Amino acid sequence: MSKVLFVKANDRPAEQAVSSKMYETFVTTYKEANPNTEITELDLFALDLPYYGNIAISGGYKRSQGMELTAEEEKAVATVDQYLNQFLEADKVVFAFPLWNFTVPAPLITYISYLSQAGKTFKYTANGPEGLAGGKKVVVLGARGSDYSSEQMAPMEMAVNYVTTVLGFWGITNPETVVIEGHNQYPDRSQQIVEEGLENVKKVAAKF
């Protein structure tokens, strides 16, 4: 049985947030098409994960060197391990998030920091880093109110680009991406943009 991991990084309600609506649409469609799949859903805002900083990093370093960890470091390392192992064990993963202030919400950055561990999702080699998680099937769902397709705006899109860059670093070079954009910039076409985007979400979910 396939293990599927759904990761949502938006705590706003679906009636107000397009990426939340994308997430709900994908999960509902996928469950209908795959009733026997083992599914785990992570709501990153609800989890309130501790920031990835000195305690977790020092704990990981000490463990790798066979040094004794403090109780605080043990707890931080165990938290990182929990989510890292969960990700590694998943056959399929879906990320859903908005673009806020040109990038992803902070909880997703924290979560990705947990996952980006040398020897687990990538390794160092003489020729540079090499990804270790390339066997996964991944979908990226992103929403942004402005249209970032122009030459001027594209460099400012650091949400989907950030996530897909990190995935590529881990060896996941072909994630399927569905983006809904411009629904705030083009209010006269907002409903159409969102509806067409959600139809694309359903199509991807049905065959995921």
Curated annotation (Swiss-Prot):
The keyword Translocase is assigned to this record: no
Cofactor remark from the record: Binds 1 FMN per subunit.
InterPro entries: Flavodoxin_fold, Flavoprotein-like_sf, FMN-dep_NADH:Q_OxRdtase_AzoR1, NADH:quinone_OxRdtase_FMN_depd
NAD is among the record's keywords: yes
Catalysed reactions, as listed in the record: 2 a quinone + NADH + H(+) = 2 a 1,4-benzosemiquinone + NAD(+); N,N-dimethyl-1,4-phenylenediamine + anthranilate + 2 NAD(+) = 2-(4-dimethylaminophenyl)diazenylbenzoate + 2 NADH + 2 H(+)
Entry's EC annotation: 1.6.5.-, 1.7.1.17
One Pfam family named in its UniProt record: Flavodoxin_2
The entry's keywords: Flavoprotein, FMN, NAD, Oxidoreductase
GO molecular function, one term: oxidoreductase activity, acting on NAD(P)H as acceptor
Cofactor: FMN
Top-level taxonomic group: Bacteria
Assembly and binders: Homodimer.
Protein purpose: Quinone reductase that provides resistance to thiol-specific stress caused by electrophilic quinones. Also exhibits azoreductase activity. Catalyzes the reductive cleavage of the azo bond in aromatic azo compounds to the corresponding amines.
Cross-referenced NCBIfam families: PRK13555.1, PRK13556.1
Homology family: Belongs to the azoreductase type 1 family.
Protein name: FMN-dependent NADH:quinone oxidoreductase 2
Native source species: Bacillus anthracis
Gene: azoR2
